[in-house]
């Protein structure tokens, strides 16, 4: 499984972001995640941001506010055309996700299907290998969900996209190939391996139910990101141990790309050192452990196979419960999904407080002499 090594870049200045992107591309990264604001989405800024980047061979992923999505697709497509890129080779994503706003802030976005269908049609003409819509299940993971919840609600989320986009006039093949799943990775090593294996199996069943013309449409495109829920301010270097095993889980389970969250993100803006360590954690697995040379090593393992079936059953049960409530959109609108995730978060925090869930360096072998107040970076509040 030769997964892509992705690093996220928060774009404050396009020239600085471009310099950073070109630098990290020489250090093992082959997938970039640009987080852009509306002011950055102009022909001039796009040219400056992607200057000297081989966009035919480097995966380019964008994150922006949903209101900027159409402008971003148009501007990116125009830039690729201006430099004569073979768009049948250029890959990436735009991560259009109106549900995230509903989940976080309760703001409804009723015409999401029409808007998404329009964006997909536009992107299909300009950048046919880019995926437009996303399922950001990583937010469930970071909020403290259990593994079965993250998977079950992610499947319901993906099914909501399939249903809405086919009703908006797209074929199931067109719709399925536009969805990218962004999962989190917790420290539960074998269960995370099983989760990704179960995800591919269940998603294939869901897409098959829509009767696609090509079996290739049942393939799940997955990006994995190490969890922020278990990252601590105290004894922060222990975060490296957690993120390393999390990355191993994702790599062994066959995801398409991985982002390792820098170990110091809980108390400061990650610097060059922590970002370099995060990159090297993946390079260690590829270049020294050769995890990219094997295919599904968990296959045939009694333990992993049984975990896969167990998680699949639990996740499928949650998927059906969500569908019974009217689908993912209605469940989010009613606050059902939020209530379930919040309840799990409260339960997990209580378990950590009682040492029923172990967090190394915090409730297990803590450093009692450490003080953290001095290293927390002050940030302006809105």
Provide a role label for each language-model segment.
Residues 145-151, 186-198, 227-240, 268-278, ...:
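Short glycine/threonine-rich loop-to-helix capping motif typified by GTGT followed
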Residues 1-26, 238, 242-246, 350-382:
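Non-catalytic terminal/interface segments that mediate subunit docking, oligomerization
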Residues 166-173, 207-214, 292-296, 330:
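Inter-helical turn/loop segments and adjacent helix faces that build the functional surface
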Residues 1-188, 219-223, 251, 257-261:
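Catalytic alpha/beta active-site cores
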Residues 28, 84, 203, 253, ...:
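Conserved, mostly hydrophobic/aromatic
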Residues 276-382:
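Catalytic-core signal marking the mid-to-C-terminal active-site face
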Residues 127-162, 244-318:
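Mobile "lid/hinge" segments at catalytic clefts and subdomain interfaces of large enzymes
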Residues 196-202, 206, 224, 244-247, ...:
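Extended, hydrophobic alpha-helical segments in both membrane/secreted and soluble proteins
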């Amino acid at each position: 499984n030769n997964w892509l090594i992705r690093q996220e870049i928060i774009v404050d200045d396009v020239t600085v972001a471009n310099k950073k992107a070109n630098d990290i591309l020489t250090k093992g990264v082959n997938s970039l995640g640009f987080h852009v604001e509306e002011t950055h989405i102009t022909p001039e800024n796009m040219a400056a941001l992607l200057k000297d980047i081989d966009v035919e061979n480097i995966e380019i992923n964008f994150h922006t506010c949903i209101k900027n999505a159409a402008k971003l697709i148009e501007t990116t497509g125009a830039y690729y055309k201006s430099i004569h890129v073979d768009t049948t080779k250029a890959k990436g994503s735009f991560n259009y996700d109106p549900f995230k706003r509903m989940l976080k802030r309760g703001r409804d976005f009723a015409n999401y299907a029409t808007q998404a269908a329009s964006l997909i049609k536009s992107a299909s003409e300009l950048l046919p290998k880019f995926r437009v819509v996303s399922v950001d299940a990583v937010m469930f993971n970071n909020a403290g969900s259990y593994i079965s919840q993250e998977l079950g609600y992610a499947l319901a989320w993906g099914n909501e996209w399939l249903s809405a986009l086919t009703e908006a006039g797209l074929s199931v093949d067109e719709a399925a190939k536009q969805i990218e799943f962004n999962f989190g990775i917790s420290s539960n090593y074998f269960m995370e391996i099983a989760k990704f294996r179960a995800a591919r199996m269940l998603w294939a069943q869901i897409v098959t139910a829509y009767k696609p013309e090509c079996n290739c449409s049942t393939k799940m495109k997955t990006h994995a990101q190490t969890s922020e829920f278990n990252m601590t301010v105290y004894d922060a270097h222990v975060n490296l141990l957690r993120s390393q095993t999390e990355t191993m889980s994702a790599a062994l389970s066959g995801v398409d790309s991985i982002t390792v969250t820098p170990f110091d993100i809980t108390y400061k803006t990650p610097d060059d050192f922590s970002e370099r360590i995060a990159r090297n954690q993946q390079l260690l697995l590829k270049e020294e452990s050769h995890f990219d040379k094997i295919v599904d090593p968990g296959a045939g393992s009694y333990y992993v196979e049984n975990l896969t079936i167990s998680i699949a059953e639990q996740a499928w049960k949650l998927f059906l419960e969500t569908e019974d409530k009217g689908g993912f959109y209605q469940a989010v609108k009613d606050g059902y999904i939020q209530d379930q995730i919040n309840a799990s978060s409260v339960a997990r925090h209580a378990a950590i407080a009682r040492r029923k869930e172990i967090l190394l360096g915090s409730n297990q072998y803590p450093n009692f002499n450490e003080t953290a107040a001095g290293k927390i970076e002050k940030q302006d509040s809105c």
